[in-house]
Amino acid sequence: MKRVIIIYIVFCSLPSFAQIDQMSRFEIEQKGSDHSWTIINMKENGVALVRDKNKFLNSDKIFEIRTLDTALVESGYTEVTVPSRVHLIGYEYTDEYLYVLLRSGENEVAHVLLLEYNLANREVEQFDIKHDFNLRLTHFTVLDRHAILAGYVAREPAVLIYDIPNSVLKVVPGFFTSDTELLDLRINENGTFNTLVTNRSTRQSKTLVLRTFDAAGTQLMEDEIPIDQNKTILSGLTSSLVREEMLIAGTYTIGNNKAAAGFFSVLADPFKEQPIHYYDFAQLGHFLDYMSVKRAEKIKNTSQRFREKSKDPEFKTNVSNVRLEEKTAGFFLLAEAYSTITASNTGPYPYGAYGPYYSPFGGMYGYSPYSSRFYNSPYSFYNQATRSDFSMLSTSVLAFSPDGKLDWDHSLKADDERKPALEQVADFWCDKNKIVIATKSESDLIVQVRFKNNEVLGDTVQILKNKPTDLVRDETDGEGGVRHWYGDKFYVWGYQTVKDPELRFEDRTRSVFYLIKVDAY
């Protein structure tokens, strides 16, 4: 197979506005029949690229795994054969191993195939994980060579742990409860993991239940947090004990409404009751910035009048929580607002608000450098009546102080292009004084910086090309994006058709997958 790999390195500085340095570009030929790449963030260890090669060996098909270092130089390449009917649904990364999760069929299955790729010797082992019931998988991660699978059996949450070295599967007790929803599964810095569950029953007091387990599934801690009876928790994320405190943050609504009314936050403490802090959207400084000034002011004024009368404001919208970042200065929640565009008579999306392979980190169920993240509610699954497209409205970052209370926020208006699946459109990094949000629009990279004193810097640049004389003939819609990598670094990816006018006519045009390292501050 002919492969074209090009590395282009350039150092530049834009002295005005936000600073954007596009440091290097990786390219590889992308033919029309090729599958898209799944990008796995390995932080300071680089990135991994995984895809179905669309080639077969006997009755099996071939997956390829390509690793790049932080300079985007290829550091390893491996091919592995798997059963022909499986497809990639998730991934995870640890310091020593890369994990790829595959399955055959759709939705609820009784077994999955796990690939364990050794980053040192580039060898791959396969593990067939079977259980006696169909599990609709919503979360996947790995802790100390224990694969943690979570989801729903019928409408009841379930958590399974597969001991990889011993090939033993265990069902974690304490779940399989009706009228409950699994909101989060998160690995902690101290070698434990959290689950976050909320009950949906109107016949009992509503609660958030946080549990912490060791890698083998032994419960170490439980914290039950009461929820205001007129409110419903829609989504929630837990921090991962980078700090001593653990924050739970997400969205809530009033009653049984499906759209969010605002954000909530609470510090977990199993030894004393901690109040949940609720913030309607109009209380945030910049959440409504995607609207016209007139409309935003009207919502803020109306919401203020409701609060003065001890009533809940009426404004609601759809919000997807993406990740919860921990810093010395506190906690930072990335969330994105969106609207739904309903199309009748087309049948339901089987996974409700998200497509069946959606992850806020672009890789189905599973890994981000911060946590596993794939939210999938059985309530939207069973109640979704029509098919919906999505229009992203804005990306917001909320900064919480160490005591768990909202401190300040930043937002960036999103492209309102209609999409068939809900996808993360931007990412961020931060320190105690500023929040940097980056996003991609076709062949442009957009960066906006907000300082805590409310000063704003921003800039838009064309995405780095292999050669200054190259002409981008086409940028594939719906493919590509921006993700935070490590430190103040992002990576940007996409698919382009590029013309090089300096080459012979028959060699001028190439179709490529590209990956760019960006320093934005």
Predicted segments with their positions:
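Bacterial Sec-dependent N-terminal signal peptides
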Residues: 1-24
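Post-signal peptide N-terminal segment of secreted/secretory-pathway proteins
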Residues: 39-153
